[in-house]
C-alpha cells in the first residue's frame, strides 16, 4: 500500500522494517542528461557520479553541493572503489576500465580481450580478493549519445574478471544479451548480474540473474533471480542483510534474498543506478535521468572502502 504521500509502495510486509515512514526523497542535484554510476567516498565524505552524455564526473558534498570532479571523463559510466580506496571507472568512449591513482594519474585495467577491443564497459565491482569484475554490453558503441558509434569487435556482450595478481582478463559469463549492473552478495558467494536487453527489444531479457561463485573465480548455476516488470534493471546494490536494491523505470525496487519483491521507492524520473552512503551508510543515493536524489532507509549498505 502507498505510504508517505506515495514515496513507498509495499508488496511484502518485510519491507516495512526497511523503510522510514518520515523520510522523504531529497533532490541533491539536477542538470544532467543521463546520470549514472554513483559511488560513495566515506573517507572524503562525498559522492561521485557520471553524467555520461555530458562527458563528466560530478561530485556532491553535503557542505558545498555539486562540483565537477572530472571533465572529459571519456563518457564514464559505472564507478566503484577498489580495496585501496581508489576510483575504478568504466569508460564508454575509450572502451576500457580504468583506475585513478592517488596522484590523479590513470591506469588502464582492461581495454581488450584476446587482442580485440572491448565493447563499452558498463558497470564494475571489486571483490575482497582484489579481483575486478565488469560487464561489457554494446550501448556505448551503438550511437554517439553516450560514446562513439563503432563496430563491435567482440563476439558478444560478456561479463569479465580481471585477475588481481596477473592482470589477466577472463570471460566468466558469455550468454547475456546486454549485461549491465552487478553486485556480490554480502558473503561474496553469489554474484548478481542484470540483463537490460529489454531496453532495445521488448522480447529480450529484462531480469537479474544469480550465479554461485566457485573458488572466487568461476560462476556456476546461473538462474533468474527476479524479473523486472517496471522497465529494465540497470545498476543495483546490496544491503547487509542480502536485500537487493535495483534501479527500474518506476523507481528503486527492493528484492529479498529469496527473490521476492518487497517494495518500491517511487522516483519521478527513470532510475539508472543507486549506492549506499552517508556517515552510517543508511542513505540511498539514486541517479535518475537528469538528477541525483537521496533517501534515508532503515538498513545499511554492504561496507566498501
Tell what function each PLM region has.
Residues 56-58, 96-98, 158-160, 207-209, ...:
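A short loop-to-beta-strand structural motif that recurs across blades of beta-propeller domains
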Residues 51, 60-61, 100-101, 163, ...:
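Structural recognition of the beta-propeller blade-terminating site
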Residues 104, 151-165, 207-212:
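Beta-propeller blade signature
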Residues 22-24, 30-45, 72-91, 96, ...:
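Beta-rich, blade/repeat-based domains predominating
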Residues 17, 42-71:
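Beta-propeller domains
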Residues 210-217, 297-304:
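Short loop/turn segments immediately following beta-strands, especially the blade-tip
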Residues 24-25, 65-67, 105-107, 167-171, ...:
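Predominantly a core beta-strand signature of beta-propeller blades
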Residues 1-26, 54, 303-305:
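Blade/loop signatures of beta-propeller domains
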